[in-house]
A protein has these predicted regions:
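Short glycine/threonine/proline-enriched tight-turn/helix- or strand-capping micro-motif at secondary-structure
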Residues: 14-24, 53
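Cytochrome P450 core scaffold surrounding the K-helix E-X-X-R motif
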Residues: 45-51
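Glycine-rich beta-strand-centered segment in the early N-terminal region that forms part
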Residues: 26-42, 53-93, 116
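Short beta-strand or tight-loop elements
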Residues: 2, 19-21, 68
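Short structural boundary motif marking the start of a folded domain
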Residues: 2-7, 33
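NAD(P)H dinucleotide-binding glycine-rich loop of Rossmann-like/cofactor-binding domains
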Residues: 89-149
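Short polar catalytic/cofactor-binding loops
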Residues: 10-14, 40-42
């Protein structure tokens, strides 16, 4: 068990309340990977979740942060080892699963990708979900044989 800080959003009679609280890794959801978050990014969905707007987050209290990059501190998956640097974007992270605005996240292994060579956690989160989505689109177009002409 490790204690850590997290941005916390709670529903109230007047809307939502925000605070930074101390949590325990024991309180995180099930998953094969425990990741110490180095960086997260700011996405429009995070703002919607933090404001309590419907359609993004159904389960409160909650920690937003749909992107996270960091280092694995525990793994029960053979594809990942302690010390691996990873990126986690998408799926349910930061929506209904404790997100990157906490110092730790626990996620299913299939939500994570190993940090590509030449990229670090800070750079990965500067790019964020929007940048990764655009890069995946360009990659697929190139795989289909399109040439820049």
């Amino acid at each position: 068990m490790t204690n850590f800080k997290a941005f916390w959003v709670e529903k109230t009679d007047d809307g939502v309340a925000h605070s930074v609280i101390e949590r325990s890794t024991d309180d995180l959801p099930e998953g094969e990977l425990l990741v110490k978050v180095a960086y997260s990014s700011l996405n429009y969905k995070d703002a919607m979740s933090a404001k309590g707007l419907p359609g993004v987050t159904r389960n409160y209290p909650h920690t937003p942060g749909i992107d996270a990059a960091g280092v694995i501190v525990e793994s029960t998956d053979s594809g990942f080892a302690e010390g691996d640097e990873v990126i986690v974007i998408g799926y349910d992270l930061g929506m209904n699963t404790a997100g990157g605005y906490g110092q730790y996240i626990r996620v299913p292994a299939n939500w994570a990708v190993k940090m590509p060579a030449g990229l670090d956690a800070r750079e990965a989160m500067i790019i964020g979900t929007a940048g990764f989505t655009a890069a995946l689109c360009v990659d697929k177009i190139e795989q289909m044989g399109a040439q820049p002409s």
